[in-house]
Amino acid sequence: RYDHNWIAVMQRSHEIAPERLIKARAASLVVAPGLIERPYIFAGNDTPGVMLSGAVRRLINLWAVKPGTKAVVLSANPEGEAAIADLESAGVKIVAALDVWAGEDVVEVEGKGRVEKVILGDGRTVSADLVVIGTGWTAPTSLLNMAGDRPVYDPSAARYFSNHLPDNVLATGGITGNGTTAELVAHGRATGSLAASRALRVRHDRRVLAARARNPEGPKPESLQDTRTPLARVPHPECYRSSTHGMVDLSEDVSSKDLVQAKKEGFDSIELMKRYTTVTMGPSQGKLETVNAAAVLAEARDMDMADIGTTVWRPPYAPISLGALAGRIFEPIRRSALQDWHEAHGASPLLAGQWVRPDHYGDPVGE
């Protein structure tokens, strides 16, 4: 998302091309990306066999894949509890079901090539080949940040939420709060109606102000008030790192030790730490790592997460191929308010960038 709701959309698996880049100017933009499950930091968390609860559930329910034989589940929310039920239905033995709310924890994973043993927070060591993590979600606020919003951390929900959005950008779904399916659908419908109302008003103004103005169809639509019922913020424990160090950015090989070292060397702001360690600068662009990185820095500086802030996201939101960017450049043709007069007096057009300007009047040879 760029200035004034100029949006770049990637369309894949199209009949004429594997990828198509669509450029659009949106009168209203609705952002509803849902939530991304967040990893947990502990020693050995990059060992094969350590999986997020959502990934485990998809393997079982969508692909009929049994992800392991003996599992340790660390849960802080219903997603982790649902993973336990799915694992048991798939014939996986649950050797330890750990409740974050009760202070239970995973400290370390041991094994050569895959998970073999798991050290728990109470000192016990259990034999397992699967560790399932269900410790929270990250709200992907990147597109909102590109619209000028700086998300604010809510410690009670352990998530970032939007702070201030322009009128032409609206958010709905999990990125704004929690709720039942019916509540989320109702909020989405109300958001769509509000976005459509604002888009109609923008279209009316554009038709009135256009160089080749034409009478708009009827009066300017009335402005709908934002009467949406805010979605609730369900309490969630702040669980980002165990008592041990582990990987924060799996794609850039950045560990929590690296972040602590960066703070010791003076790179103690979230922006400086990012550039010094390259955390969040890999293919995922911070979708999995941003919150954990901020949590490690807050702990190292003995500060609240809300005071650490966030980095500034820049387009693109997701990686794109150079092939999708190749091709002819299509730009809008822009005309001044005098263009009709120029044409009526025999002006020959001259393309000056996007603008159509008069080059000369009449026939130069005849003159």
Please provide the spans of the model-predicted regions.
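Residues forming the flavin
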Residues: 1-335
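N- or domain-start disorder-to-order transition segments that initiate the globular core
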Residues: 331-367
